[in-house]
Regions:
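N-terminal interaction/assembly modules
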Residues: 1-121, 125-135
Length: 135
């Protein structure tokens, strides 16, 4: 498992659990740092988790607007929390990072296949595909 994959999975866990607990991402990240710093190696992996979570937190309005613009007959609040967390991470990476677009989409689809509902991976692939074509 690549360092970036592990970082994306850790960021997904953090975003999802923070939403489920009604916790701010800043507080969740502080708790994560205390709990996970020794487990994540190399240090660049831990830094990428921080970058993702801070990036999503700082740009959540723009991220959510991009996602919402590509939802057909859905609202962001109606999405499963798992799908919402995966999309927020992927959209942040697509719009605000230097990560390769194909890798971002593939990782998001892999997370959706592992943690999402039956159709989550196709749904997420469609939303991200539309965002990539637009950008």
């Amino acid at each position: 498992m690549s360092a970036r994959h592990k970082a994306r999975k850790a960021a997904f866990d953090l975003l999802y659990s923070a939403e489920q607990r009604g916790q701010s991402l800043g507080v969740a990240l502080d708790e994560f740092d205390v709990r996970e710093t020794a487990r994540l190696e190399p240090l660049s992996e831990l830094q990428y988790v921080r970058d993702i979570v801070r990036g999503v937190d700082d740009n959540q309005i723009a991220i959510d607007e991009h996602i919402s613009a590509h939802l057909k007959d859905w609202t962001l609040n109606r999405l499963f929390a798992v799908d919402r967390a995966i999309l927020r991470i992927a959209v942040w990476e697509l719009l605000f990072s230097e990560a390769p677009k194909d890798a971002v989409r593939a990782e998001a689809i892999a997370l959706a296949e592992e943690y999402g509902s039956d159709d989550a991976s196709r749904f997420i692939a469609g939303v991200l595909g539309a965002i990539v074509r637009e950008s």
